[in-house]
Amino acid sequence: MELDHSVVPVKDKEAYSKQIAHVMGWTFLGVRGSQGHVRVNDSLVLRFDDKDPNANRKASHYAFHVDAGEFDGILERAKAEGMTYGTNTREANMEWNDLHGGRRTFLHDLEGHSYELMEAASPPALD
């Protein structure tokens, strides 16, 4: 079983979809209806929806296992776009920490969503 897609509420589907696709190194597929579609990998599409741009939205959190080159590239593009990142979902200290033998940081966007980047995957079981 694989996750096919998830819908993320945003204020401007097209601008947001293009920016996050650029920063994360994903593919902007285009806009259909109230959603901007972004291909993350072969099996996952994120749909950024602005059906109700004035709605009281809750922030979402997404975690991605990335390699060292992806980690560095994403942070470089995020800084160029004016995005902040930090050692947790609330910190914008422009730092990363170590987790399970790899670097980890949290990108913060203007919508309140956070994107966790982890060089080491989550452990297979809780200790």
Locations of the language-model features?
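Short glycine-enriched loop/turn motifs at secondary-structure junctions
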Residues: M1-E2, A55-A59, D98-L99
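Vicinal oxygen chelate
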Residues: D12-E14, A63-S114
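Short glycine/proline-centered loop/turn elements that form peptide/ligand docking sites
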Residues: G33-G36, N97, P124-A125
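Short, charged/polar, Gly/Pro-enriched secondary-structure boundary elements
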Residues: S43-R47, A55-N56, H113
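Core segments of cupin and vicinal oxygen chelate
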Residues: V7-L46
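N-terminal beta-strand motif that seeds the catalytic metal site of vicinal oxygen chelate
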Residues: M1-A15, Y62, A121-D127
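Conserved beta-strand in the GNAT
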Residues: L46-F48, F106, E116-M118
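Short aromatic/hydrophobic contact patches that present stacked aromatics
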Residues: H5-V7, H37, H61-A63, R104-F106
